[in-house]
Curated annotation (Swiss-Prot):
Belongs to the intradiol ring-cleavage dioxygenase family. InterPro entries: Intradiol_dOase_C, Intradiol_dOase_core, Intradiol_RC_Dioxygenase. This is Putative dioxygenase RBE_0329. PANTHER family: DIOXYGENASE, PUTATIVE (AFU_ORTHOLOGUE AFUA_2G02910)-RELATED (PTHR33711), INTRADIOL RING-CLEAVAGE DIOXYGENASES DOMAIN-CONTAINING PROTEIN (PTHR33711:SF10). It comes from Rickettsia bellii (strain RML369-C).
Length: 208
């Protein structure tokens, strides 16, 4: 009987390892996103995830409307809920339309003109699937001739991440994105979305 049980366990173990070759472990692909810092964040972030206007304001901007979205994960590839995500960027003219947090910066990178409703900054909170999204516009080419935005993710149990997201063709993805309001994309089927999965150092698995 003992010999039978031993043989059964050996056979079961071999089948598990055989199956694992056919189903690659995605956890091994979860690489921590590297930090890239930016000195031009706003003194005060707008509380909405729509950078095209302040809450209750009519949108009036000069540029191409886009969606920036993704998932926040911990280093074990577990989706992170209730993470604060901050995004800031220059407008189509290459300047930031707000007052900067830091004082020792190139003031020529900022503008006080109010001919556009574009705010240049926004805030989002991840849902229980770790998803976030922003409504924004394509910025002026500024870093290495690339169109990019800056993002920071904060969570009580994880190390804060700050990085740059390049809005290149390789990051374009489907408009089918979780809890995004369909009204934002239905009138414009050509509206482009850019996807970025952000991996923070640390683990939140104990919460699940």
């Amino acid at each position: 009987m003992k010999k039978f049980i031993f043989c059964f366990l050996c056979f079961w173990t071999l089948n598990i390892f055989a199956a694992s070759k056919g189903y690659p472990n995605k956890l091994n692909r979860c690489k921590i996103t590297r930090n890239i810092f930016n000195d031009y964040e706003p003194k005060v972030f707008e509380p909405t995830n729509n950078l095209l206007r302040k809450t209750g304001q009519i949108s009036r901007f000069y540029g191409e409307k886009v969606i920036i979205k993704g998932i926040v994960l911990d280093q074990n590839c577990v989706p992170v809920a209730d993470a604060k995500v901050y995004l800031w960027q220059a407008g189509s003219g290459g300047k930031y339309p707000y007052e900067p947090l830091k004082t020792r910066v190139d003031k020529r990178r900022f503008t006080g003109k109010k001919d556009s409703s574009f705010t240049g900054s926004g805030t989002a909170t991840t849902n229980n699937k770790g998803e976030y999204y922003f409504v924004s516009m394509l910025p002026y080419k500024s870093v290495g001739n690339l169109k990019s935005v800056n993002i920071r993710v904060e969570h009580a149990d994880l190390k804060t991440l700050e990085t740059r997201l390049d809005l290149s063709n390789k990051n374009i993805c489907s408009n089918e994105c979780g809890e995004i309001n369909p009204a934002l994309i239905e009138p414009q089927q050509h509206l482009r979305s850019y996807c970025f999965d952000l991996v923070l150092q640390g683990a939140t698995l104990k919460r699940y």
